[in-house]
Amino acid sequence: MALPLILLCFAFLSPAHAARVEEILTLPVSVTLRHNETHNQNLHVGVFRDDSAQKPQPFLVLGHGRPANGNFGAFRVDGFRKQIDYFVNRGFVVLAHLRIGYGASGGPDVENAGPCNNRDFAYSYNVGGQQTAQVLTLARSLPYIDPERGVVAGQSYGGALAIEAAARNLPGIIGAINFAGGGGGDPVNRPGQPCRPDKLEALYADYGRTASVPTLWLYSENDAFWGKDIPHAWFAAFTAQGGKGRFVQLPAVHNAGAGGGHAAFTRIQSEWQVHVDRFLNDIGFTTP
């Protein structure tokens, strides 16, 4: 696939990090939808890196979630600023993309999985996964990136997409990190009772059959989107079919609104960072 890139803005050298560079690229993507329809449009991809590196750096593709309240326009490429900084400080080039339908990327809601009682998670994650794969291809083409040393990570819907990417065995990816990944949650109207968790459990089992890279799953004990027990069942289904992974039960998150522990990625970084450090070290990414 050709990758014509349009540089929207070459950001700045931060005073606190003299060599920190941020830029926003547009990436033309093409996704196959239901009935073999094709949708083509540009994605906004934020690229965050340390320009002082003396050799190509590993990369991390970071995926965002999906709003329970339908506020798709609120997403930003730098929405996880503190978490992006952590990964850049670990030596990664971070690519944080906005999928079709979200934030500045705009467009239709191509990931819609249907009604709550019959959610088609396989379709929805396949559409998101096609976009992840094309962002990965972009990453591996950039001159300052080591194309064989990549990680895919995400939060909420993006966490599930990280496991979907692991199941694709995409070139250059050697690990996946799932922060509170899942789908169909509504912490206000159905706290701890997401739509059709059984269907998502079966899908995670399917992912486990083909995924070959190590994975890390992190969930807070008071995640109001999924509850405490359902994520354990999802992880068990994945590993029972051959998926490699480690599950970390993070502590409860307080004063975080209706979602509770679903905000662990942004609210208790000190709790999860030690586990992510260990995982990255184990798969060959030592601290610079």
Task: Walk through the language-model features, giving the residues of each.
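The conserved beta1-alpha1 loop
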Residues: 63-65, 219
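The feature captures the conserved acid-bearing segment of alpha/beta-hydrolase catalytic domains
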Residues: 175, 181-241
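N-terminal cap/lid segment of alpha/beta-hydrolase-fold proteins
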Residues: 19-54
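Alpha/beta-hydrolase active-site loop
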Residues: 114-143
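Short substrate-entry loop that stabilizes the transition state in hydrolases
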Residues: 54-57, 65-104, 225-227
